């Protein structure tokens, strides 16, 4: 009997998997176990941005504004997309620049879709400073971002609706769904 992960890796042919979704959707916490199960490398794009910039994301926003941050984010995504066999946790706003989609679609794009109430709860419990939520009414700011981004996230190759599953369970769910996107090369050869 064939190992399903080995078969999936063969089908992926080194294509990277890009996790997209709102801040707090679990891209990093899901990406790590997903990469481990696939034997892929894991990259947190926000961490790479901080390394490249030499400061934190809130400091980049303060110094360069959102436009400056998005420019660095696009450069980092371009560099990451040159590599293969990665699971990449992207920043929540990566989808807002049309030019980023070319890099994202060099791999498989998976949207981690978490409902508003869960996002609010997760972000409330999260110690990470989120520059776009540093407003008098963070919930209204989140609503605006959701309204702008949900249609863009909908362009993903695969949507995974997350309720209260653990990151490990979400990773397992992605592994079960990925084969539905990718043809088995042995089936293609037989035709």
Curated annotation (Swiss-Prot):
It comes from Synechococcus sp. (strain CC9902). Catalyzes the specific phosphorylation of the 3-hydroxyl group of shikimic acid using ATP as a cosubstrate. One of its GO terms (biological process) is aromatic amino acid family biosynthetic process. Monomer. ATP binds at residues 24-29, 130. One of its GO terms (molecular function) is shikimate kinase activity. It is found in: Cytoplasm. InterPro entries: P-loop_NTPase, Shikimate/glucono_kinase, Shikimate_kinase/TSH1, Shikimate_kinase_CS. The keyword NADP does not apply. Keywords: Amino-acid biosynthesis, Aromatic amino acid biosynthesis, ATP-binding, Cytoplasm, Kinase, Magnesium, Metal-binding, Nucleotide-binding, Transferase. The gene is aroK. It holds the Pfam family SKI. Its cofactor is Mg(2+). Its EC number is 2.7.1.71. One of its GO terms (cellular component) is cytosol. Binds 1 Mg(2+) ion per subunit. Substrate binds at residues 46, 70, 92, 149. It catalyses: shikimate + ATP = 3-phosphoshikimate + ADP + H(+). Mg(2+) binds at residue 28. This is Shikimate kinase. The keyword ATP-binding applies. Pathway: Metabolic intermediate biosynthesis; chorismate biosynthesis; chorismate from D-erythrose 4-phosphate and phosphoenolpyruvate: step 5/7. Belongs to the shikimate kinase family.
């Amino acid at each position: 009997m064939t190992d399903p992960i080995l078969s999936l890796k063969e089908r992926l042919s080194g294509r990277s998997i890009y996790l997209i979704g709102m801040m707090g959707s679990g891209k990093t916490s899901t990406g790590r176990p997903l990469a481990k199960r696939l034997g892929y490398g894991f990259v947190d794009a926000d961490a790479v941005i901080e390394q490249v910039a030499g400061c934190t994301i809130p400091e980049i926003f303060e110094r360069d504004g959102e436009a400056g941050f998005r420019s660095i984010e696009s450069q980092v995504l371009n560099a990451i997309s040159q590599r293969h066999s990665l699971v990449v946790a992207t920043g929540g706003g990566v989808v807002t620049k049309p030019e980023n989609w070319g890099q994202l679609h060099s791999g498989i794009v998976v949207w981690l879709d978490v409902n508003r109430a869960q996002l609010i709860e997760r972000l409330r419990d999260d110690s990470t400073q989120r520059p776009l939520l540093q407003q008098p009414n963070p919930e209204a700011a989140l609503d605006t971002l959701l309204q702008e981004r949900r249609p863009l996230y909908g362009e993903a190759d695969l949507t995974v609706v997350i309720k209260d599953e653990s990151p490990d369970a979400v990773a397992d769910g992605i592994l079960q769904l990925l084969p539905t996107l990718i043809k088995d090369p042995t089936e293609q050869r037989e035709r």
